Amino acid sequence: MASSNFYKNLGPRKLTTIIDFLHDIIEHPKIYEDIVIHDIKILQEASRNDISFLSNTKYSEFLKTTNAAACIVPKNFKGEVNPNTILIHAENSYFAYGKLIDFFYAPIKSYPAKIMKSAIVAASAIIGKNCYIGHNVVIEDDVIIGDNSIIEAGSFIGRGVNLGRNARIEQHVSINYAIIGDDVVILTGAKIGQDGFGFSTEKGVHHQIFHTGIVKIGNNVKIGANTTIDRGSLQDTIIEDLCCIDNLVQIGHGVKIGKGSIIIAQVGIAGSSTIGKYCALGGQVGIAGHLNIGDQVQVAAQSGVAQNIEAGKIVGGSPAVHIMNWHRQSIIMKQLIKKRPK
């Protein structure tokens, strides 16, 4: 439930207005002309003034008892439902829910176009129009910040960094040696552009390799809290457009992540590996260095990838194998344990 301390409810709104706004609704009844919706809530908490949604069928049982006035459901949903709840069938119910949240709520916190007095901004830095530079932010020489960008308290933007338009940089982020596109969101505590983990060992002494590469981040990228992205040694570290990177992810030097890929929390990608376009790496996946992961590969959570993966494959386990082989291995292991003498 959204707290009024942090979010402003823009309702109430007529159900007809909601359906017109969503656009992608493909089927709905014609008996809702006078229905007014005050809020969005989960099925278990919704009242007769609320709308809800169903995207995961694990929760379909709550449709029988929900008090929601209406519920957005998947295109082909035909489950049992409270007869007083209007079902609105959408092509993608979760996407419709996301649009609906934007329609009903706005953050109370605002960012006026100003540079706070405690911020330190180099004379040679270029700050675009309508930007907010928060308390104790440091922006070094020759930085370029695009229009309509927000940089929150305590963040550090190192010399020569280029940050595109409409960026949102949350608190205590540090960015060095980076060129970043438009509409990028970087959450609290992320670190971008630091030295990679590159050492040569000579006579028992580890020597740091000087890194001359940078980090290049495309447009419409989200980077989660406390994620670290190292700059390359010779080749750049590259995050292409539309990638979503969760919290606590480590991306090594010289890694390339293809367009639209999703990286879940606590993934570690060792240096010089390439992740293809529209891949999905589950939580705590480990990718060894110098590997090539093809386009549209899916890797199950906690898998360890030690060899190249062809495009379109689904893998799991450690070492990662084809998902069906992993399931077979798990079944055989259970059978062996049962047969083992006590």
UniProtKB/Swiss-Prot annotation:
GO CC field: membrane
Keyword Membrane: no
UniProt-listed Pfam families: Hexapep, Hexapep_2, LpxD
Keywords: Acyltransferase, Lipid A biosynthesis, Lipid biosynthesis, Lipid metabolism, Repeat, Transferase
Alphabetical list of Gene3D superfamilies matching this protein: Hexapeptide repeat proteins, MurE/MurF, N-terminal domain
GO biological process: lipid A biosynthetic process
Catalytic activity: a UDP-3-O-[(3R)-3-hydroxyacyl]-alpha-D-glucosamine + a (3R)-hydroxyacyl-[ACP] = a UDP-2-N,3-O-bis[(3R)-3-hydroxyacyl]-alpha-D-glucosamine + holo-[ACP] + H(+)
Subunit structure: Homotrimer.
Protein's UniProt name: UDP-3-O-acylglucosamine N-acyltransferase
Organism per entry: Rickettsia canadensis (strain McKiel)
Lineage start: Bacteria, Pseudomonadati, Pseudomonadota, Alphaproteobacteria, Rickettsiales
